[in-house]
Regions:
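Peripheral, non-transmembrane regulatory/ligand-interaction domains of membrane transport proteins
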Residues: 1-112
């Protein structure tokens, strides 16, 4: 699932993929392969960058390729048994978009 958000003078608008425009934030959570391919095609963001945070064992790092930057960090995540664990959060900075990718909904991104 994903949400596309755009800041406007009246607040924050949620857009459809067909309405994607420069300056949007795409927040991706537990996406299907089809959704990832749609977003990659619409944004020209590398599929490898979009899928990096979907591997629970992925290590934190910064990677650059062309005009895109991938920042991968581990964030705290509360498991159902009340134990904390970590999950990768991918932050992709592209020329026209910012994208966040995570396996689970999380408080880090929800605060925005």
């Amino acid at each position: 699932m994903y949400k596309i958000l755009k800041s406007t003078p009246n607040g924050i608008d949620e857009l459809e993929l067909e309405q994607l425009e420069k300056g949007c934030w795409i927040d991706i959570v537990s996406p299907s392969p089809e959704e990832l391919h749609e977003i990659a095609a619409a944004t020209k963001i590398q599929l490898d960058f979009l899928t990096a945070a979907l591997d629970e064992e992925e290590k934190s790092r910064i990677e650059t390729e062309d005009d895109q930057i991938l920042i991968l960090v581990d964030i705290p995540f509360l498991r159902s048994n009340k134990d904390y664990d970590t999950l990768p959060l991918g932050i992709i900075i592209a020329e026209d978009f910012i994208v966040t990718v995570c396996l689970e909904p999380n408080a880090v991104v929800a605060d925005f």
